[in-house]
Structure formats: structure tokens, C-alpha cells
């Protein structure tokens, strides 16, 4: 396992998420949490064992709501994954992307990513 290999563990960050669920024949009902609530987990050397929203106060924890894309403060979204991964690799955001382009999602209280 990764945990048993110190050299690998020191250079690896895992970012895990999934697609949202659905029920019946759709998945757009904003009143059904399973239509929009998904896991977004990170693990690795330098990743704090902390809630992403505690580390990223500029993001809005949605709680039981589903904020629209036009809201002033956004929740962490699946769309943040690609630009977070690129940031971890020291690369710029995907050209033309609209989510996470500032690459300001941090995984540590040091804000060093």
C-alpha cells in the first residue's frame, strides 16, 4: 500500500471525488441531496486532516442547499478537481476552464497547497 512506502507517500497526493447520484429518471432536482452532494477527499503528505471549508474560508459550505453557479461564493465543486491537480503538479489552470481557475483551493493551513 501507499501508506507502507515512505518514498511514495512523500510524493503522492490523492484527490478523490465521484459523479453525483440520481433517482428515477433524472438528477436535476435541487431538493434531492443525492442529485448534487458528492465526496471530495484528499490525502497525502502535506494534506491537513481538516474539512476543506475550514481550510478554504472563501468557499461557501453548501450545507443542505445547492447554490447556483452565479452565487457570489461558491462551494467546492467537482470542477475544481482538474485545476487542483494541476496546481499540485505546479502547472497552470486549464485554458478556458471556468471553475477553480484561480487555483486557490488549498489542502493545508500553510496555504502552500
Over which residues does each language-model region extend?
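Membrane-interface soluble catalytic domains
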Residues: 1-11, 20-113
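Generic enzyme active-site microenvironment
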Residues: 15-17
Amino acid at each position: 500500500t501507499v501508506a507502507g512506502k515512505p518514498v511514495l507517500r512523500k510524493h503522492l497526493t490523492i484527490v478523490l471525488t465521484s459523479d453525483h447520484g440520481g433517482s428515477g429518471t433524472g438528477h436535476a432536482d435541487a431538493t434531492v441531496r443525492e442529485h448534487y452532494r458528492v465526496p471530495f477527499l484528499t490525502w497525502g503528505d502535506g494534506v491537513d486532516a481538516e474539512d476543506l471549508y475550514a481550510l478554504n474560508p472563501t468557499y461557501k459550505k453548501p450545507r443542505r442547499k445547492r447554490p447556483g453557479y452565479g452565487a457570489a461564493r461558491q462551494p467546492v465543486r467537482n470542477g475544481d478537481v482538474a485545476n487542483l491537480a494541476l496546481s499540485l503538479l505546479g502547472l497552470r489552470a486549464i485554458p478556458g476552464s471556468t471553475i477553480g481557475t484561480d487555483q486557490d483551493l488549498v489542502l493545508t493551513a500553510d496555504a502552500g497547497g
